């Protein structure tokens, strides 16, 4: 154990926190090109076909990104914007595609939580 005098001279170091979204490199979002669009199954106990795309980012990283919402128009070579945010039941998927920007269309017929899915306000 360190003495008080040693701690006065050199205080204890806090370990550096590791980022969960390293590929963003401290940016809020990053642009990239879809290299593969596919569906995958979640971990137990869930069951579904989750829509995922593999994205080559402008900084050279290649990451898996979840496509939220019902239906999408993405295919290979689509340009997308990704943000941080993991999908708990898909191992290795730590990013979300931003709906309603670049080549990714918003979710049509969305009434609630529209801003999260890039949906315009419906005409009343």
Swiss-Prot record:
Per UniProt, the keywords (alphabetical) are:
Methylation, Ribonucleoprotein, Ribosomal protein, RNA-binding, rRNA-binding, tRNA-binding
Q: Name one GO biological process term.
A: translation
Q: Which SUPFAM superfamilies match?
A: Nucleic acid-binding proteins (SSF50249)
Annotated region Disordered: the residues are 1-22
The molecular function GO annotations come to: rRNA binding; structural constituent of ribosome; tRNA binding
Q: Quick check: keyword Magnesium in the entry? A: no
Secretion signal span: none
What GO terms fall under cellular component here? small ribosomal subunit
Q: Which residues carry this modification: 3-methylthioaspartic acid?
A: 89
Q: What role is this protein assigned?
A: With S4 and S5 plays an important role in translational accuracy.
The record's subunit annotation is: Part of the 30S ribosomal subunit. Contacts proteins S8 and S17. May interact with IF1 in the 30S initiation complex.
Q: Write down the HAMAP family for this protein, in alphabetical order.
A: Ribosomal_uS12_B
What family is this? Belongs to the universal ribosomal protein uS12 family.
Give the protein name, as stated in the record: Small ribosomal subunit protein uS12
Encoding gene per record: rpsL
